[in-house]
Amino acid sequence: MIRRSVLALLAVAAMVMGCVVVASPAGAAIDTAVVVPSPNSGARSNVLKSVSCVSTTSCVAVGYYVGASAYQSLVLNWDGTSWTKVDSPNSGSNANVLNSVSCVTASSCVAVGWYVAESGTESQSLVLNWDGTRWTKADSPNPGASNNFLNSVSCVTASSCVAVGTYADDVQVSTSRSFVVNWDGTSWTKAESPNTGIYDNVLNSVSCVSESSCVAAGYYVNGAGTQSLVLKWDGTSWTKLDSPNSGSFSNIVSSVSCATGFSCLAVGRFDNGIGSVDQTLVLLLTGPEPPATTTTSSTTSTDPVAPAFTG
């Protein structure tokens, strides 16, 4: 009786203050890992490189398999019970590889990667769109004469996605430049992205929490070696964030994930300079949080603020 009275008083207090009391979600309760059967195409190598889930009964995994003469795109769908292979388009008869997938609903996914043109020498960006029924190839920019690779994609809505990677500079063909493309629901367009120095700049991963808040990460090469590379998007432009390096020679960021517009983690590896032994690298990216506001029953949520990371 006492407990019910206390709960009743709390409920009344919440209504008087115009606030909604919501129970906190339980912590992670995963305690078991099992191998789930998944289909393979042919008797040669099958590789899954990325997965995206929108519910326990809707996931998509992508990668590639080795066909009769070249790599072919590979897409599997999860329905809560089993994985099934889904037909996915391939451009030409040469290699087609999917590196990353991002879904916002069961009927809206984007997968990105690369394929080799019919000439057999130029790699082109590859983007596939899922509409809930089938995968179709989308037109995507290729700023370089060769080596146009998309390594990662992040979608916040069906009409807002960002994909990142690298392409070969037309002037210095052996030099890679940062590559960012945006999806607005209609077309993919190349965005201007900064490069550090005259040597390689490669983006391996991107994470968006809103249309105006994304972080991309990878590495660039200078005279001292390979350095961590972090770019941030504020809804208007991409800018480089000063990021630390643990190793004196090699620092590579392979993945980034943002929980909010002011809190991200980036991970990868660095060379400790002793016998070329790689060590784990973790970068905490933070920025000033927005001012606290009082939440009332009539308040509507807004997009997270653009990242203002301090390093």
PLM feature segments, named:
Residues M1-L10:
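Bacterial N-terminal signal peptides that target proteins for export
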Residues R4-S5, C19-P291:
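Residue-level hotspots at or immediately adjacent to binding/recognition sites across diverse folds
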Residues P291-G311:
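C-terminal cell-surface addressing/anchoring modules of secreted/extracellular proteins
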Residues L9-V20:
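Bacterial N-terminal signal peptides
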